[in-house]
Swiss-Prot record:
It is an enzyme of class 2 (transferase). It comes from Coprothermobacter proteolyticus (strain ATCC 35245 / DSM 5265 / OCM 4 / BT). It is found in: Cytoplasm. Keywords: ATP-binding, Cytoplasm, DNA synthesis, Kinase, Metal-binding, Nucleotide-binding, Transferase, Zinc. One of its GO terms (biological process) is DNA biosynthetic process. GO terms for cellular component: cytosol. Belongs to the thymidine kinase family. This is Thymidine kinase. ATP binds at residues 15-22, 87-90. The keyword Kinase applies. InterPro entries: P-loop_NTPase, Thymidine_kinase, Thymidine_kinase_CS. Zn(2+) binds at residues 144, 147, 182, 185. Homotetramer. It catalyses: thymidine + ATP = dTMP + ADP + H(+).
Length: 198
């Protein structure tokens, strides 16, 4: 389901790397422009992989964007917008959550894209909160680079080997640093299994 109105609606597009999250965000933003909605895109300032002033998918789809360090500044930027797209939401601080809530109260349609899990296979940053608050969630999958099955995990590689559990969570990169993997082929040396108690 794709909503074209702007009545305080939060859409979250999530999944592992190379699943098409940014591509789907760009598609929805372009459709909003076609529907003559005032539309802006936001990206974290630290995401400088492909373009400083655009959200760009790994496959090359793009939409002009404003790089942001402080999530609170989004409120001023989005004052006249009906549709607000936010890419790589997992890189923003928790301050993004009240900003999104205020955008929704101001009847904006907010479309967020971000990784649900970090390279360790654990919930990433503010994404669990945004997924819980969302009116609509789209979970995308990639293809495992090892076996070709459905991939739901992001594998970080350092010199061609799986990154260790205790490596830093955030490392901006693309094909040179990450692969999509299925549960069977996702490796995190040093990770201990945690059993949940009821």
């Amino acid at each position: 389901m794709e909503i074209i109105t702007q009545d305080g609606w939060l859409e979250v597009i999530t999944g592992c790397m190379f699943s098409g999250k940014t591509e789907e965000l760009v598609r929805r933003l372009r459709r909003a422009v076609i529907a003559k909605k005032e539309t802006i895109a936001i990206k974290p300032a630290l995401d400088t992989r492909y373009d400083l002033v655009a959200v760009v998918s790994h496959s090359g789809f793009s939409f002009n964007a404003i790089p942001v360090e402080d999530p609170k500044s989004i409120l001023g930027m989005a004052k006249d917008a009906e549709v607000v797209g936010i890419d790589e939401a997992q890189f923003f601080t928790g301050e993004l959550v009240p900003v999104i809530r205020e955008l929704l109260q101001n009847k904006k349609r907010v479309i967020v894209a971000g990784l649900d899990l970090d390279f360790r296979g654990e919930p990433f940053g503010i994404m669990p909160t945004l997924l819980a608050l969302a009116d609509e969630v789209t979970k995308l999958h990639a293809i495992c680079s090892v076996c070709g099955n459905i991939a739901t995990k992001t594998q970080r590689l350092i010199n061609g080997r799986p990154a260790r559990y205790d490596d830093p969570t955030i490392l901006v990169g693309g094909l040179e640093t990450y692969e999509a993997r299925c549960n069977l082929h996702h490796e995190v040396p040093g990770k201990t299994l945690t059993l949940f108690k009821e």
